Regions:
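Conserved RNA-binding domains used in RNP assembly and mRNA/RNA metabolism
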Residues: 2-95
Length: 95
């Protein structure tokens, strides 16, 4: 079976539905626009999600979802990565 996979990455402006661990016996669903990553403390990272209208009064608010509680991510609307990849350019100092 020959399957081709393209590189997938979380891109700012894309819309995702994230299912994560919530309270003891409950899963938490977060749906909205991905705004980026944030460092939480010293060694933890989270996703910044602007909540959509499905969250009622919380719509427009930012939710931080720690990476270690994420179970799955559904890609609802993917945007292309418009940021320039600096790692492909040679960086040096001339002075």
């Amino acid at each position: 079976m020959n399957m081709e996979y393209k590189k997938v990455e979380l891109t700012e402006g894309s819309i995702y539905k994230i299912t994560s661990l919530g309270s003891r016996d409950k899963l938490l669903e977060t749906e909205g626009v991905f705004k980026g990553f944030i460092n939480i403390g010293v060694d933890e990272t989270g996703l910044l999600i602007e909540l959509n209208k499905n969250h009622g009064d919380m719509a427009g608010k930012i939710r931080i979802v720690p990476l270690h509680v994420i179970l799955l991510i559904d890609v609802l609307d993917a945007k292309t990565n418009s940021k320039k990849d600096d790692s492909k350019e040679m960086s040096h100092y001339v002075g």
